[in-house]
Structure formats: structure tokens, C-alpha cells
């Protein structure tokens, strides 16, 4: 006992001295920590769902648990397991905690899984302890990953509780950024508000408890799950200096604590952070990442998550400035509409991502949401040398979530192109589009092929293709793709530019009667994902969308400013070309302007067709005509071109807005609060439903359709494949 107190006194004395100048013990600890921060190759994040959704058919033993996602990592290129003991929502954990809430309940919905946590606790252990011991026994590190504001509990409703919604949030709704009735525009209402000292203190205590009670090598503070930390930001603002400083002081406090614990146990605890890869974006969200690096509060920065904003060189340069290792974060792709021939989740794609990241100068790679611990690429991507002789795929875009989902105007920070089947680019005759593609440093040693997937284009000669200024010829059509050989000596390490131009429009399927490009006959409810590209870009409130008498009944029963039930379509139109929109509907109710309407934005101008019980109006042009819109269905035909807009009702011209289509679609004051980061749809989209927050409205819709003289085809995807001269077997 005497020896113990002497040790505690020595540590306390050294820490007191640290306030004036670091002691030799602390300097040694920091030097060891700095050295350790540069030793790993691959960090593998395990989200903890192996315990939360444990297969009922398996025995409740540590060994059976480890076989799910950990055992196969031994001997691979993975050097560190970062284990997340759920932390969803804030305060829920599957490790043994006295401060948080132990999550032992089963998650309803599957008879094939159950929560293993209670079984392991009865056996004197828990998921984090089991994984930590396994990692150390197999020569790997173990970090504990805390999701700093996970909102997988966002499906919670007061009348329908969600199992991941913690008691803390139910007991302290004042800790939350919003409420079920007052949802923010950016992020989830169930996020906790880090502007509050009480929330920051809880986060600190959760982290401190693990550092004191588990023999972990480091902690991962996952700020990407999820990027909502301040009420001011979630409701459309930017973080203030005071708010940022509050979170920064939390980081400082965590660093001090890890050094205290490190001195007590004689071994440092590393701090890693998972954050956006652009410091300015993170700054506005409330995370002063550059300050944390400058002050020495973090040891490793892992960049990107739902989106990558900049090429890796941007974050690498920041790391070098502050002497902090930088890791490229590889999240699993979630792109919809991919073709099975060339996919972002393939082994070849992970190789390409790694090759490119190493070429950019990263210090390591971080793997997120990969559930197969035996995945082949985990034994291939740990070094550039291991990757060099292997086939690869290079996509311009891997993840396509919107930065504006968490920060108003956040899309402006995106310089990495967003080109996916669900985010196509328009190809037109006479105008080339340039697609940047980032490629690793080994592509020149074998063969390279450019693969292009363009809607209805089956003739390779229909496209004029140049890569870094070199014309690509001799293309072939292969399984819905156009393949063009790319001379290896014309492939550059790093940024490459592919230019595509239509020589002529392809033969297209016969248009719908009337020449309509897109037609939604409202005899069914659109369902995700088959509905795409139609989207509902509003927070669910008191609204109804259902079939009634063969028509779509869409009703806004809420007076919340953000309650705007609608369907929107990202049409490809040009303001200088004629666009015709037609809708057939019967008004049921409208007690305010725009409670039932069509919104038409062509990239230059925006206008509403406002349907009221006794009139139809062009909102901005202030043109109106009397009409009983409730007794029967009417067909409204809107024609737009340049600055002209006209409306016909049941085939007869009713409103003439010649020269009055002039309200700018680019000015944010004319924008609606579209969610999920799609605020840019305000500039160019077709929208029907409600655009009035305070008002209530409902209508029966029979059809919505449009045709345009703008002629283009969709560039749906693009990828570069590289193959070495020889392909050796992968080694572990």
C-alpha cells in the first residue's frame, strides 16, 4: 500500500511540474508516443455490430465472437484494430461502464441475431476487452473507437421508441440539437449539442473511464459519426469562435488525461481523430482540427468519411506542416446503380484507392465499415511495393454523400468530382466535359484502359475521347461500357484529365407519346431506391403520401417551417431551351400561398405555379387567373424558354408571363430548405407538392411530366483499369 501511494504521489508531482515545464518522464512518454504514431500501416475499424447483432446460432463465447470479424486479421497487413463498443446513441456502450449506459437489449427486427454483451459480461469480460486481448496476443494494437455524436437513433419517435435511443437523451432533451417536432436542416435532431459544458463533460468522462480501465493502445475519436456538434450549425449557421474553443478545450483535456494515465501505467495512449479531410470545412462545423494538430493534442489524423472533399495531397500537406501523421480513410462505397462489371467495392478498387493514397504521401490507411476480416485486399494494400504488381481500378468518385448535409453551403468545399450512376454528368454535342481521375504511381508499368458508361451510347466512335491531351481511339463496346486503350506512357501519377465530347446524339428509345422525356403517372407511390432520381428532400413531419382512388394523395398537415412534403426531380434543362411541364391534379385544400404548387427551376430562373381553391397564379410574375380547382381535375401545362413563361389550363392559354421569368434560381433567398445536402437542387429541378412551411395543403395528383429540347446523354460512370505485365499471388 505504501509503495502504491509513493507511486501515485510521484505521478501527481510530475504532473504538477508539467504545468510549468514537462518532466523528463513526460518528455520520454511523448517521444515514445510520437514514435508509435508512425509505426502502423493499416487501421481496421470494427463498428461493434458483431456483438450487437450476434448470430443466435453461434455459441456465446469469446472465440466464436472473434471469428466473426477479428480472427482473420491476424497475419494480414492490418496492424491496428480500432474497436467501437457501439456508442450509439451518445452514452450507449457495450463495454463495462459505470458512467454510461450498458447496451444489453436485443435490437428488434431479426430472429437470427441477438446482443452478445450481457453474455460476455456474465463471463467476466466484454466485447472491447476480448478484442483488446486478441489484438495484443497477435502482435496488433487495439484502439478504442468512440463515435463522438452517433445518431443511428435518429429514427426515434416519441410514440415509437427506437432501441438505440439512450435514456440520457430521454431524460435530458435539453442536451439535444433539436426535437422530433423541430428538426434541424443539417444533421439529425438526436445529436447532442457540444456547445453545452454538460455534454462535453460527459464525453470526457466516457473516454477517461475507458483509458483508466482498459489496456488499450490508443483512442479513436470518430467525429465523422456524425458531423453535427452545434445547434447553431445544424440550423444553418457556422460555428463561432466560442463554440469551437469549447470543443478544443475538450480535446486539450483529453490529451492531458491520456498523459496522466500514460505516466501511471508507463505506456502512452495515442489519440487519433477521424474528421473531414478539409480543415476549413471542419472549422466551420466546429472542429478546429488544425489547432489540435498544432497544439499536439492529436497523434494521427484520419481523413474523410461519407465524402472526400480534396485530393489526399491537401491533408498530407497539413500533416507535414504540423508533423502529424495522416491516414487516408476508406469507407465502404454506397453508390447506387452500379454495373456489376466494374464496382467500387471490388478488390481492384480498394487496391486503386490505396495505390493512389500512398502515391499522395499518406502515412497509413484507415478502413471503415468493411465487415469481412478475410477480405483479400487487407493482405495487399499495406505497402506500395505489395500493391505495385496487382490489377487496380481507379474511380473519380467513391462516396457521393453531400457535404451540405452537415453544413449550409458545404458543397462549395468539394473539389473531388462527384460522378456516379446516381450523380451523372451531361454529355452534349459540341462541348467537352473534363473529368479528373486520380491514379497511383505504378500505372505506367503495364496496360491501362478507360471505361466509359454513357446512357444509350453503344458506339465507341460516338465519343471524342482525350486523356491528358492524347486522343484515345480503337474503342470497343463491352457489356454496356465503352473501353478505350490508354497508352501507359500517357498515364500520369496523381491527377489525370479525361475529356469527353459527343460527336453525335445516339439513337434513343422511342419517346413517350407527346415526346415526354420523363413521365410520372401517379397510379403508384414511388419507393426508394427504384424511384431515383426522384427524391423527397424534406424532414418527415405531419404529412400524408398515399394512393386514393387511383391518384397520389399528397398532403401537408404541418405548420412547421421545414415541413415541405414534395417530390423533386433533377432535370437536365437549359434556360435558353424550351421546357414544357404538365401536371394533372385536383386540389383538396390550400390555406396559404404555395401550400400546393409546382416549382420550376431551370438553372437561371425559378417560378412557382401556385394552386389555390379559387385561383391559379405565377408566384413571382404575379399573374393570376380565377378557377375552381377543387371540384374536378385540371391539366396545367407550363412552357418556359429564356425569360418567357406561359400557362395553359385544360388546353387553353390562361397566363402569359412573356419577359417575366426573371427571378434568379441562384439567389439563396429564393431557395427552399432542401435536406440531405441537396440544397443545390434549388437551382435546377422540377418540384411538386408543398413549398409553404406555415401553410397546409393537399391535392390528388394524376400525372407530372416534362419534355425539353435540351439534348444530352447521361455520363453515368467512368473508371480506369490498370494491369501489370505479371500478376503474382497475394501474400499475407
In which residue ranges do the predicted regions lie?
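Extracellular glycan-recognition surfaces and repeat-rich motifs
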Residues: 516-517, 521-557
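Active-site-adjacent "subsite" loops/lids of carbohydrate-active enzymes
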Residues: 35-59, 111-133, 143-209, 213, ...
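Active-site neighborhood of glycoside hydrolase catalytic domains
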Residues: 198-323, 349
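Beta-strand-rich ligand-recognition modules
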Residues: 454-512, 621-633, 657-680, 711
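Secretory/extracellular carbohydrate-interaction modules
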Residues: 548-620, 708
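Short tryptophan-centered beta-strand motifs in secreted/extracellular beta-sheet-rich domains
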Residues: 142, 581-583, 632-640, 645-649
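Ligand-recognition surfaces built from glycine- and aromatic
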Residues: 514-518, 661-732
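Catalytic domains of carbohydrate-active enzymes, especially glycoside hydrolases
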Residues: 64-91, 213-218, 297-303, 359-364
Amino acid at each position: 500500500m505504501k509503495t502504491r501511494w509513493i507511486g501515485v504521489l510521484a505521478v501527481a508531482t510530475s504532473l504538477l511540474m508539467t504545468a510549468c515545464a514537462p518532466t523528463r518522464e513526460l518528455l520520454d512518454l511523448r517521444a515514445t508516443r510520437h514514435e508509435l504514431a508512425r509505426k502502423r500501416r493499416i487501421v481496421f475499424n470494427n463498428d461493434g455490430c458483431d456483438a450487437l447483432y450476434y448470430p443466435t446460432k453461434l455459441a456465446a463465447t469469446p472465440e466464436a465472437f472473434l471469428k466473426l470479424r477479428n480472427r482473420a486479421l491476424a497475419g494480414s497487413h492490418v496492424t491496428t484494430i480500432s474497436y467501437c463498443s457501439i456508442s450509439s446513441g451518445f452514452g450507449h456502450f457495450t463495454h463495462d461502464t459505470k458512467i454510461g449506459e450498458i447496451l444489453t437489449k436485443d435490437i428488434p427486427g431479426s430472429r437470427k441475431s441477438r446482443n452478445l454483451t450481457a453474455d460476455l459480461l456474465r463471463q467476466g469480460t466484454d466485447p472491447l476487452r476480448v478484442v483488446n486481448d486478441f489484438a495484443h496476443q497477435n502482435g496488433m494494437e487495439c484502439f478504442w473507437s468512440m463515435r463522438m455524436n452517433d445518431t443511428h437513433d435518429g429514427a426515434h419517435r416519441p410514440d415509437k421508441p427506437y432501441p438505440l435511443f439512450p435514456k440520457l437523451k430521454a431524460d435530458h432533451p435539453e442536451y439535444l440539437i433539436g426535437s422530433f417536432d423541430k428538426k434541424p436542416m443539417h444533421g439529425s435532431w438526436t445529436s447532442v449539442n457540444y456547445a453545452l459544458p454538460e455534454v462535453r463533460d460527459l464525453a470526457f468522462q466516457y473516454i477517461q473511464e475507458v483509458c483508466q480501465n482498459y489496456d488499450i493502445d490508443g483512442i479513436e475519436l470518430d467525429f465523422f459519426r456524425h458531423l453535427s456538434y452545434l445547434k447553431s450549425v445544424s440550423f444553418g449557421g457556422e460555428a463561432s469562435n466560442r463554440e469551437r474553443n469549447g470543443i478544443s478545450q475538450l480535446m486539450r483535456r483529453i490529451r492531458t488525461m491520456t498523459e496522466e494515465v500514460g505516466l501511471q501505467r508507463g505506456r502512452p495512449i495515442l489519440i487519433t481523430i477521424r474528421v473531414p479531410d478539409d480543415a476549413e470545412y471542419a472549422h466551420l462545423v466546429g472542429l478546429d482540427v488544425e489547432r489540435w494538430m498544432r497544439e499536439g493534442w492529436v497523434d494521427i489524423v484520419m481523413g474523410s468519411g461519407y465524402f472526400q472533399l480534396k485530393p489526399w495531397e491537401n491533408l498530407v500537406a497539413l500533416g507535414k506542416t504540423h508533423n502529424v501523421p495522416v491516414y487516408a480513410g476508406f469507407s465502404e462505397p454506397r453508390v447506387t446503380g452500379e454495373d456489376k462489371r466494374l464496382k467500387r467495392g471490388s478488390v481492384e478498387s480498394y487496391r486503386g484507392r490505396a495505390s493512389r493514397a500512398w502515391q499522395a504521401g499518406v502515412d497509413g490507411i484507415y478502413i471503415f465499415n468493411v465487415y469481412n476480416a478475410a477480405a483479400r485486399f487487407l493482405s495487399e494494400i499495406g505497402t506500395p511495393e505489395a500493391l505495385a504488381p496487382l490489377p487496380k481500378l481507379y474511380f473519380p468518385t467513391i462516396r457521393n454523400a453531400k457535404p451540405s448535409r452537415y453544413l449550409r453551403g458545404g458543397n462549395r468545399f468539394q473539389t473531388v468530382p462527384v460522378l456516379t450512376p446516381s450523380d451523372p454528368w451531361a454529355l452534349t454535342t459540341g462541348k467537352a466535359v473534363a473529368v479528373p481521375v486520380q491514379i497511383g504511381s505504378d500505372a505506367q508499368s503495364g496496360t491501362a484502359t478507360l471505361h466509359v458508361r454513357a446512357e444509350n451510347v453503344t458506339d465507341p466512335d460516338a465519343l471524342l475521347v482525350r486523356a491528358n491531351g492524347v486522343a484515345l481511339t480503337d474503342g470497343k463496346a463491352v457489356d454496356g461500357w465503352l473501353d478505350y486503350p490508354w497508352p501507359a506512357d500517357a498515364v500520369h501519377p496523381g491527377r489525370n484529365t479525361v475529356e469527353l465530347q459527343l460527336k453525335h446524339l445516339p439513337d434513343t428509345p422511342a419517346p413517350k407519346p407527346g415526346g415526354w422525356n420523363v413521365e410520372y403517372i401517379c397510379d403508384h407511390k414511388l419507393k426508394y431506391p427504384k424511384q431515383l432520381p426522384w427524391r423527397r428532400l424534406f424532414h418527415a413531419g405531419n404529412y400524408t403520401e398515399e394512393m386514393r382512388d387511383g391518384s397520389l394523395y399528397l398532403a401537408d398537415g404541418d405548420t412547421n417551417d421545414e415541413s415541405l412534403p414534395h417530390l423533386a426531380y433533377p432535370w437536365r434543362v437549359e434556360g435558353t431551351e424550351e421546357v414544357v411541364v404538365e401536371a394533372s391534379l385536383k386540389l383538396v385544400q390550400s390555406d396559404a400561398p404555395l401550400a400546393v404548387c409546382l416549382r420550376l427551376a431551370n438553372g437561371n430562373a425559378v417560378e412557382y405555379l401556385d394552386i389555390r381553391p379559387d385561383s391559379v397564379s405565377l408566384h413571382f410574375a404575379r399573374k393570376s387567373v380565377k378557377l375552381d380547382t377543387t371540384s374536378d381535375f385540371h391539366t396545367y401545362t407550363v412552357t418556359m424558354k429564356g425569360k418567357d413563361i406561359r400557362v395553359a389550363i385544360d388546353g387553353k392559354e390562361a397566363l402569359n408571363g412573356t419577359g417575366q421569368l426573371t427571378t434568379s434560381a441562384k439567389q439563396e433567398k429564393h431557395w427552399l430548405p432542401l435536406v440531405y445536402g441537396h440544397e443545390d437542387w434549388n437551382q435546377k429541378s422540377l418540384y411538386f407538392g408543398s413549398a409553404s412551411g406555415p401553410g397546409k395543403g393537399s391535392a390528388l395528383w394524376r400525372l407530372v411530366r416534362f419534355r425539353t429540347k435540351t439534348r444530352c446523354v447521361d455520363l453515368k460512370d467512368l473508371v480506369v483499369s490498370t494491369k501489370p505485365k505479371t500478376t503474382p499471388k497475394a501474400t499475407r
